[in-house]
Amino acid sequence: MPHSGLLKSPVPFLPGTSPSADGPDSFSCMFEAIMESHRAKGTSYSSLASLEALASPGPTQSPFFTFEMPPQPPAPRPDPPAPAPLAPLEPDSGTSSVADGPWTQRREVEESDAGATLAPRKELPSPSHSEDSLGLGAAPLGSEPPLSQLVSDSDSELDSTERLALGSTDTLSNGQKADLEAAQRLAKRLYRLDGFRKADVARHLGKNNDFSKLVAGEYLKFFVFTGMTLDQALRVFLKELALMGETQERERVLAHFSQRYFQCNPEALSSEDGAHTLTCALMLLNTDLHGHNIGKRMTCGDFIGNLEGLNDGGDFPRELLKALYSSIKNEKLQWAIDEEELRRSLSELADPNPKVIKRVSGGSGSSSSPFLDLTPEPGAAVYKHGALVRKVHADPDCRKTPRGKRGWKSFHGILKGMILYLQKEEYQPGKALSEAELKNAISIHHALATRASDYSKRPHVFYLRTADWRVFLFQAPSLEQMQSWITRINVVAAMFSAPPFPAAVSSQKKFSRPLLPSAATRLSQEEQVRTHEAKLKAMASELREHRAAHLGKKARGKEAEEQRQKETYLEFEKSRYGTYAALLRVKMKAASEELDAIEAALAQAGSTEEGCPPPHSSPSLQPNPTSQPRAQRPGSEARAGAGSTRPKP
C-alpha cells in the first residue's frame, strides 16, 4: 500500500498486475538492474539487508518501499543474450593500464554470474534511483562508466602496492603488502631513470621496509659483477646512482650492493657480511685519502690493522687488502652527480657577481678545504703592498709539496683585509683581479708569520703558516720590509681571527687538529685580547699535561708519531696566541689604528719583548732537509757564507 515519505523510484508498477509464474515481475527485473548498476561500480550486496544498513529510514518512515509509476508503459523485454566470454588476461609487459587492474577482473566475473538473468541495459527505460534515499550515486544504466571514473574508482580501492603496479611513483610507508611484480616494475623504472632522477634512486633503495628491500633486490639484478674485484664492482655501481641521504640510508644501499656482489662472486669472499664490511671500509678509506679531513692520512698498515678479525672472526687476505688500498689511493671512488644539482652548481659558478670566490681547482696556491673559501671585501682596507718572492714549502696538513711546484716566483703582494693577494703586476687601486691572481691568494685568518732563521739560501726570508697548515716562504727586498710584512700580517690576523670552534666530542684516539673559522670576529678589541690570552693559557696548560703524561714513556711507531704531532701543534698554537695577544696589547697602548704607529712602538720596546716571535720559532714540523749543512767543495765556502749572512738591524 502507498505511504507518504517513502523511497520512490520510477519503476512501472501498474495496478492489477501481479507476479507471473512464467518469469519475474517488473519489480524484480528493475531491482536486479539496480543491483547490476552497483556491481558495475565495484559494489556488491548479498541481500536487501545490505541496503537497509546503508539507508536506514528515520523513525517516522515506513520500512516498506514504494515505487512511482511512469507515464508510459515499459518497453517489451527480449530474451536475454548469452553472456560474452571473458577475454584471457595478457601477460605483464612492463606497462600498466586500467584494463589490467583488479576492478575489471571483478566486474567481468560478476557480470558473468548475473548476465543470464539480467536484461540488456540499452533496452531499459534508463531508470535511476534516488541518491537521497539510498545514499549512493549510480551511473546511467544505458552506458559504460567513463574512463576517468574507472581510474578514480580503482585508485580509491587499491592499496599502495597495486598503485605502484599500475605505474604510480608512490612508495610504501611500510612493507606490509609488498608485491613482487610492483617491485620489479619500480626497479626497472629506477634503473632506466624512467620518471626518476639519479638522486631518487638511493632514496628508494635506502628505506627500511619490506617493499624497498624488494625493489633494491630487483634493482641490483640489473648489475652483473661476476669476475670483478670488489673495488671494480663498487665503481660500476656508484656511477649509476647518486649516493645521497643519511648515513643509515647509504649504509642500506651498500648492504644491498654487498649482497649482490657476493651472489655474483661467492668464491671471492667468505661471506656476505664480510663483503659488506669490506665495502664500508673502502668508502671510509676513500674519504680519508681524498676527503677534506685534517690530520695524517691512513696508511696501508692502518687499513689492514683496522680490519683485523672482522672477516667473520678471522682476517681478510693481506694481499687482497693491499690491492684494494692501492686501488683507492691511486684512483678515488666517484659516484654519479644529480644533473639538476650539477646545473644549479654551474649556474652559481657562472654568477657574474659572486659573493664568495670558491676554490674549485687544486694547486699549490689553492685551498683544499671548503672551510677556507676566500670572501673578498670590496671596501676592505689595504694594510701593505710591495714586492715579494714566494716559494711553496708545504701543502695543506704540512704535506710535502711536489718537487716541480717548489720554485721561487716573483709577485707583487697586496695585504687587503684578511687576504694576501699575489699579482704579477704592481698594485693599482680599483683594478679587478684575474682568475690566476685569485687562485694565488692566501687567507691569513689564524695565520702566523715568523722569521725563517733556519733558511740560509736566501736573505730576508720569512715563513707564513696558514690555518690549514700550508707553509710558504716569502723573500722581501730588505730586512726592514721583511719585519714590516711579519708585523702587519700578524696584527691583521690577531685583529680579525674569530675564536675557534669548541672541540668535537669523539671516542677517536687519533689526534686531529680542530677547524678554525674563516669569518671575521665580532668581538670588540678588548674582548679579542682576552680571548687570545685565555687560549694562550689553555694551550700552555695542555702542553704541560701532554708532556707530563708521556714523560719517561717510550712510544714507538704510530703512537710516537701522534704524540709528536700533538706536541708540535700545541707549541705552535701557544706561540701564535702569545703573538696575537702581545701585538694587540701594543696596538691598544699605541691608541692608533695606523700600523705604522704599531711598528714604531714595537721598534722602541723591542720586538721579542712585545710579543713578536723570536727567530728560533720556525713553523715547520721538521727541519727542512734542504737546509742541513752539506759537504762543500773547496772555494765554495765564501759564496755559501755570503748567502747565509743576515744583515744586522
Swiss-Prot record:
Matches recorded under PANTHER family: GUANYL-NUCLEOTIDE EXCHANGE FACTOR (PTHR10663), PH AND SEC7 DOMAIN-CONTAINING PROTEIN 1 (PTHR10663:SF334)
CDD domains documented for this protein: PH_EFA6, Sec7
Source organism of the structure: Rattus norvegicus
Statement: the UniProt record of this protein carries the keyword Hydrolase: no
Composition-biased stretches (Polar residues): 618-630
Modified residues (Phosphoserine): S345
Keywords of the record: Cell membrane, Cell projection, Coiled coil, Guanine-nucleotide releasing factor, Membrane, Phosphoprotein
Name under which the protein is recorded: PH and SEC7 domain-containing protein 1
